[in-house]
Amino acid sequence: MLYFDNAATTLQKPEEVAQAVKESFSYIGNAGRGANEASLFTSRLIFQTRKQIAELFHMEDGEQSSAAERVVFTMNATESLNIVLKGLLHPGDHVITTGMEHNSVLRPLS
């Protein structure tokens, strides 16, 4: 799992972030929600981003899916941690952690 969101601790944003936010208001479309141009544009943009992330981390295509199809976006780190912890762990599994862990790790483990 990779945590790309440092917005809570970073005051200044790169100019590219401001530009991307500005552009997002011009291309309003829900990916996968239709065949209209706005929806298709957004779908392509998301898939292109998945491809770039897969390439960045040298992910290889699997037998049944491309590397880009295995890149998953979540709303935040808490959701990502819940998916991993609740999806991989089973009752009786042993997990080593410390009291320094964030609440979003400790709660699913308790």
Residue ranges with predicted function:
Residues 1-110:
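Pyridoxal 5′-phosphate
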